[in-house]
Amino acid sequence: MTPSPVLNLLVSNDDGIFSQGVRTLANTLVAAGHEVTVVCPDRERSATGHGLTLHRPIRAGIVEDVFDPRIKAWSCSGTPADCVKFALHAVMPRYPDFVLSGVNHGANLGTDVLYSGTVSAAMEGLIEGIPSIALSLVSFTATDFQPAADFANCFVQHLWRSPLTEPTLFSINIPAVPAEQIAGVRLTRQGLQRYSETFEERYDPRGKRYYWLAGERVKEIPQPDYLRLNRRIPTDVQASQDNFITITPLQYNLTDINGVNIIEKTNWLDHLNFD
């Protein structure tokens, strides 16, 4: 039997350094024999996307007595993307084998990945050429992150032994059910979700008006045919509803190849009158 590799891993998240998800993930990985460095926001930073801190100082410090003592842990006042940048360029003496982000408390499915700090932390690793993994538990209330952490350990070992030809970000959503109720693992494509957005008008104790973003998710919307997506592969939203672990490969390049081809083929820009 091939011995398990000892991997150099960076772990971050957007739920903050004290969240149960990142603690379970990091402790599970170090217990499996890996070298683990944790750099996380010092507070909740969900839905911050890929924002960076550019106009105020970033403060960071070593965190003790939160994780397994074998783990080097830091908290950072910045965003999830800041945390990964800081880890790669100010904390770790060499780049990690993989960047992991999570385990997030709540799903990151469909177009939600565009807002997700969890996915953006992993995307920062990918931008640096490091294979990266974003892990999310499909529940905002469940508290058992162990099945997700165990799957993460299994996945990084598989990725090490069978690497893809190019670095990829894997967005992985794990059902919040007992391990025996997980239906399996599915390769998925990104779905399309929209929300019924509501800005609730409220007033603070001083009578000043403010707004609170609320709303509910609208059912998944079919994606247009011109995207030429492989319909045989289910969306992450569909497979997650059936209690599958979903694995969606993502990239940072947002170029609309279909749009480029149409514009080039029709000489569309030739008709732009700009003197």
UniProtKB/Swiss-Prot annotation:
Cellular compartments annotated: Cytoplasm
Cofactor note: Binds 1 divalent metal cation per subunit.
A Pfam family assignment: SurE
InterPro entries the record matches: SurE, SurE-like_Pase/nucleotidase, SurE-like_sf
GO cellular component: cytoplasm
EC number: 3.1.3.5
The keyword Metal-binding appears for this protein: yes
Positions with a binding annotation for a divalent metal cation: 14-15, 46, 104
GO MF, any single term: exopolyphosphatase activity
Keyword Nucleotide-binding belongs to the record: yes
Reactions this protein catalyses: a ribonucleoside 5'-phosphate + H2O = a ribonucleoside + phosphate
This protein's UniProt keywords: Cytoplasm, Hydrolase, Metal-binding, Nucleotide-binding
Top-level EC class as recorded in UniProt: hydrolase
Domain of life of the organism encoding this protein: Bacteria
Major subcellular site: cytoplasm
Cofactor: a divalent metal cation
Task performed by this protein: Nucleotidase that shows phosphatase activity on nucleoside 5'-monophosphates.
Similarity field: Belongs to the SurE nucleotidase family.
Protein name, as recorded: 5'-nucleotidase SurE
Organism: Synechocystis sp. (strain ATCC 27184 / PCC 6803 / Kazusa)
Organism taxonomic ancestry: Bacteria, Bacillati, Cyanobacteriota, Cyanophyceae, Synechococcales
